[in-house]
Structures are given as structure tokens and as C-alpha cells.
UniProtKB/Swiss-Prot annotation:
<dbReference type="Pfam" id="PF17349">
    <property type="entry name" value="DUF5378"/>
</dbReference>
<feature type="transmembrane region" description="Helical">
    <location>
        <begin position="110"/>
        <end position="130"/>
    </location>
</feature>
<protein>
    <recommendedName>
        <fullName>Uncharacterized protein MG135 homolog</fullName>
    </recommendedName>
</protein>
<feature type="transmembrane region" description="Helical">
    <location>
        <begin position="236"/>
        <end position="256"/>
    </location>
</feature>
<feature type="transmembrane region" description="Helical">
    <location>
        <begin position="38"/>
        <end position="58"/>
    </location>
</feature>
<keyword id="KW-1133">Transmembrane helix</keyword>
<dbReference type="InterPro" id="IPR035319">
    <property type="entry name" value="DUF5378"/>
</dbReference>
<feature type="transmembrane region" description="Helical">
    <location>
        <begin position="6"/>
        <end position="26"/>
    </location>
</feature>
<feature type="transmembrane region" description="Helical">
    <location>
        <begin position="153"/>
        <end position="173"/>
    </location>
</feature>
<keyword id="KW-0812">Transmembrane</keyword>
<feature type="transmembrane region" description="Helical">
    <location>
        <begin position="84"/>
        <end position="104"/>
    </location>
</feature>
<keyword id="KW-1003">Cell membrane</keyword>
<keyword id="KW-0472">Membrane</keyword>
<dbReference type="GO" id="GO:0005886">
    <property type="term" value="C:plasma membrane"/>
</dbReference>
<feature type="transmembrane region" description="Helical">
    <location>
        <begin position="176"/>
        <end position="196"/>
    </location>
</feature>
Length: 285
């Protein structure tokens, strides 16, 4: 990791500390929802106008003139289809997650935040901190993005922090979240697989792991290197990465439900105390 890449770590840690530092005040003032709305609006607008609109209107923004994605070596038509239909999990969360926050759909927003947090985390710490950077590129890398990876860092950075804010500021988690994460994963991956089938042969990557190409590049490739797996064995990388991802998402769901577990314990103790009191009153009578 280059010295410049430590800036990614520093900014991310600083962002986390800011969220944690303001959480007690925000909860005390009971302005969680308004803060989440502002945060969600910033993420949505940044990603939509900094990235999404470029692929919706490629002729206007000049992306049609580029033959290939210089970073991932993916044909531009494939990249455009993936971006327009949100076939990658992180862009999906960045644009759809804020909508459910505005609609006050706490449970849906919470489930999306679990996936958004995990996806952003593995990209920030599994890929972006290893991206070769020149000093003159750092500002563009942080705020605009390099080549066809428009607002790549900022999208994952803001998604990571918004997800954390949802965990800390929202009260939309319950035990049923364990069921919802499986429903969402099944529904979203089925949607991606359907779109890949509809555009058969036209989409070659950026499909949240549906296509083998996804497992041979980016953060998944770095996972393979870290675990000393065969970097060309897509099936092995898929199996290991899927298992680790599933474990991480379930663990995240457990962690965000800690307040729920605490409340259940308190409720159980209150019920037990009430029964003891009732029994004592009956014996006195």
C-alpha cells in the first residue's frame, strides 16, 4: 500500500469518528431522521449526477466515445448496462437506499444498510487502499474518480458512513431482520441474474458476482491474493468469498440487533418480576 493510499484509511476512520462523536447529541435532540435525510440526499445526488447520469446520456457526456473501461477492461456497453440497471450492489445501495430512507421505510433501509456497509467496506479496504495513485491524481481520485470509475471512492465512502449512521441513528432493526437479509439477497441476485440473461452476451462483468469475471478482479482478486488462493480459479474464489460474505452479513445483522437483544432480556426480566409480584400478592391474600 502506497503512502497516498493511507489517505483513504485516514478519511474513512475520521468519518467514522465523526458519526460516532455526533451520535449521542443527535439522539438526544431526536433529529436522527432529519440527519439521515440530509445524508441520504447528499449520497443520492452525488452518485446520480456524478456517475449515473453519464451512462443514461452517454452522447451528451462523452462516454460513448470511449471503447473500453481502462480500469476493469470491460466493454463500455456492458459497463453502461450494469450502471443503468444497478447490477452492482454498491451503486444499487447508493441510489436506492436513500429513497427508502426518505420514505421512512426503516426495516427496508436497515436491511439495505447492512449490505451497503459490507459492500462499501470490502471495496474501501479490499481494493481502494491498493489502487496505484500518483500525487497529482489524488484530488480527482477522491472527488471525481479515475477513468470510467466515476465518483468511485466518494460513492463507497459516503455509503459506508450512511450505513453506519443508519445502524446508530435508526431503530429499524429487529429479529425479523435475519429473515429480511435472505429475502433481499435472493431477490436482488435473482434480478441481476435475470438482467444478465435478458442481455445475454452483452453484460460481461460488474454483476455482484453473478458472472465469473467479477471474482477475478477488484476486491475479490485481492481476497484471493490475501488468502493465497489460485487467482485464476473463479469457482474457488467464489466459494470462499461467498462464504465469508455470508458470515460477515449475518454477523453484522447480529451486531445491529444488540439493542434488540438487550430489550428482549429486559422485557423477560420485567415479565418474570411481574409474575413473582403477582404470586406474592396471591400468597398474601
Amino acid at each position: 500500500m502506497q503512502s497516498l493510499n493511507y489517505l483513504v484509511v485516514i478519511l474513512t476512520v475520521a468519518g467514522v469518528l465523526v458519526i460516532l462523536g455526533f451520535t449521542p447529541l443527535i439522539r438526544k435532540l431526536k433529529i436522527q431522521f432529519y440527519c439521515l435525510q440530509v445524508f441520504a440526499a447528499i449520497l443520492f445526488l452525488y452518485v446520480f449526477f456524478g456517475r449515473q447520469i453519464i451512462y443514461i446520456f452517454p452522447d451528451i457526456y462523452g462516454t460513448a466515445a470511449k471503447a473500453k473501461n481502462a480500469v476493469a477492461n470491460v466493454p463500455l456497453d456492458s459497463l453502461r448496462l450494469s450502471r443503468i440497471f444497478l447490477l452492482d450492489l454498491c451503486p444499487f445501495f447508493a441510489l436506492i437506499g436513500p429513497i427508502f430512507i426518505f420514505l421512512r421505510q426503516k426495516k427496508v433501509a436497515g436491511v439495505l444498510a447492512i449490505f451497503g456497509f459490507y459492500g462499501a467496506a470490502i471495496t474501501l479496504f479490499g481494493e481502494l487502499i491498493f489502487t496505484p495513485l500518483k500525487q497529482e491524481e489524488i484530488v480527482k481520485f477522491l472527488f471525481v474518480g479515475l477513468e470510467n470509475n466515476q465518483v468511485y471512492f466518494m460513492m463507497h465512502f459516503l455509503s459506508f458512513l450512511l450505513s453506519l449512521a443508519v445502524f446508530l441513528w435508526d431503530d429499524g432493526f429487529s429479529l425479523i431482520s435475519f429473515f429480511y437479509i435472505h429475502v433481499f439477497a435472493l431477490a436482488y441476485l435473482s434480478y441481476v441474474a435475470l438482467m444478465v440473461n435478458i442481455f445475454k452476451g452483452q453484460i460481461t462483468g460488474n454483476t455482484t458476482g453473478i458472472l465469473a469475471e467479477d471474482w477475478l478482479s477488484g476486491e475479490y482478486k485481492n481476497v484471493a491474493v490475501f488468502l493465497k488462493l489460485d487467482p485464476k480459479n473463479a469457482d474457488l474464489i467464489f466459494g470462499v468469498s461467498f462464504g465469508l460474505s455470508y458470515f460477515a452479513i449475518v454477523l453484522l445483522t447480529v451486531l445491529v440487533n444488540i439493542p434488540t437483544f438487550i430489550q428482549l432480556t429486559k422485557d423477560k426480566q420485567m415479565v418474570k418480576l411481574a409474575l413473582q409480584l403477582k404470586k406474592a400478592q396471591a400468597s398474601v391474600a
